[in-house]
């Protein structure tokens, strides 16, 4: 009777719903592995699981006084990670047909992301040959019973969902020692837990994701600032997004690709989201290219309108572009300010309270954005990403990192590059972190000063940029930095060394390409290995195609939710060419992408770039190739 009453209370207070197949818990050998986000996790499992499980509780918690009261209602077995006898007890319970609940993290998260995973839970599953059933709680981390006070905005009774994921078999790894088998099993369980998060990610558009962030982190939470030094909250950013959408719809059609030739600034961000919410497709143009390159991009994506700023063109000495490229309609921001009417202002005010009403009907798999890459053949191609692929890469990054509302990003890499766009804009904006947008990464003295002045905790850059920042910066300029990510070119040893010696900071390397939105692999503090570009991101499949004459490694092919919809090529701009590859038998397979890179992947999943294929891929790359780095360097020419 008590349990029935408590179930009713929780359903009413937290609007709790249970999703997934509960029949999985009837498996004769079952290990249940929930994420651990609050003190209520165990209570809800006790109340809403269709079975009566045994709870394996780490001994430092199980021996506390209040657990004696809890043990009256649920069966508890203390689990000591370093005591093999405790593991044997749980294995025997599983063999008796008793379902076991183990929190693999061993403690409540203090970051909002997965904490480290203890090997004990994985070893129990591997020894007993039990199926692993991941359970994810969403919403409990926003309650007062979490440990995220001061980091996230907490609510008294947020909406809570308990999601049950498909059962997975965790086999005993092949290794020479029990210690290695235990470690590899733990890494496999970590992978299962990360994939569980990816499997339960919301399916939405990029504008809907902005609204979710606004609700989660607070409408008046500061989120973005540029060189005007006027910081916008989520609410004031939404106001600018609505204004941009209202204006853009006057001279564009739904489904049309709009070219944006703008620097890193809040207005650029507002234009991207504003175009998207009204069903337009932003095409982010490279303003460092010449008129010929710009014409190619316009032709490839069938762009009829370019939105830019006279002030920007004049400052960067780009006025010749509008004079030489005459086949499109040039729209200037300065001309649009005077066109806003009273009716427009009332429309914006209304939709500031009801923003979803401003959206046109869209699906997550619809075209969301066009980026451009020249690849190895130096011919411009349009890379079309959907809402789902962009947000999948954001979720992959959030799954392996712990970015939170206390962080502040220095985003100086151009937004027309996938690295700058996804890692420098979408990820922090949707994580509640603040962003400072700076238009030129080659201002080697200014960027470190701004990092210091703005108390930035995350910095993105290339090896060359980071090296020059290190030489120009005062030793205390980077005192608040806790994460430095290098991409686009190989991270040089001397760059690593000067950052370690002068600032005591380890630079994290990654690997990616525009077609993957862009991150494919990334070293993070929890999972890092020197000489590699990190592990392949969760929810991505990979395979190595053997290459004649190469004994170690192979050509990397990928498939995952962050993959582009396809290419736009000059030969047929109206045709979207889906990704396709030849497998090792020479058969064509769609939905796979050939990176052209020769890599090796060790037993722990760490990826090492061995050679360069047609894409000029290199170690530490996070977007495109050699041509992208050259493009970035051209930014300085206008200064």
From Swiss-Prot:
Region of interest: AMP-binding: 233-619
GO MF terms held by the record: acyl-[acyl-carrier-protein]-phospholipid O-acyltransferase activity; ATP binding; long-chain fatty acid [acyl-carrier-protein] ligase activity; medium-chain fatty acid-CoA ligase activity
Record CDD domains: LPLAT_AGPAT-like (cd07989)
A Gene Ontology biological process term: phospholipid biosynthetic process
Catalyzed reactions: a 2-acyl-sn-glycero-3-phosphoethanolamine + a fatty acyl-[ACP] = a 1,2-diacyl-sn-glycero-3-phosphoethanolamine + holo-[ACP]; a long-chain fatty acid + holo-[ACP] + ATP = a long-chain fatty acyl-[ACP] + AMP + diphosphate
Protein origin, superkingdom: Bacteria
EC number: 2.3.1.40, 6.2.1.20
Catalytic center residues: 36
Gene3D superfamilies (UniProt xref): N-terminal domain of ligase-like
Chief site of localization: membrane
Location in the cell: Cell inner membrane
Membrane topology classification: Multi-pass membrane protein
Assigned GO CC terms: plasma membrane
Transmembrane segments annotated in the record for this chain: 258-277, 409-433
UniProt keywords, alphabetically: Acyltransferase, ATP-binding, Cell inner membrane, Cell membrane, Ligase, Membrane, Multifunctional enzyme, Nucleotide-binding, Transferase, Transmembrane, Transmembrane helix
Region (Acyltransferase): 15-138
Family (UniProt): In the N-terminal section; belongs to the 2-acyl-GPE acetyltransferase family. In the C-terminal section; belongs to the ATP-dependent AMP-binding enzyme family.
Protein purpose: Plays a role in lysophospholipid acylation. Transfers fatty acids to the 1-position via an enzyme-bound acyl-ACP intermediate in the presence of ATP and magnesium. Its physiological function is to regenerate phosphatidylethanolamine from 2-acyl-glycero-3-phosphoethanolamine (2-acyl-GPE) formed by transacylation reactions or degradation by phospholipase A1.
Protein name: Bifunctional protein Aas
Protein source organism: Photorhabdus laumondii subsp. laumondii (strain DSM 15139 / CIP 105565 / TT01)
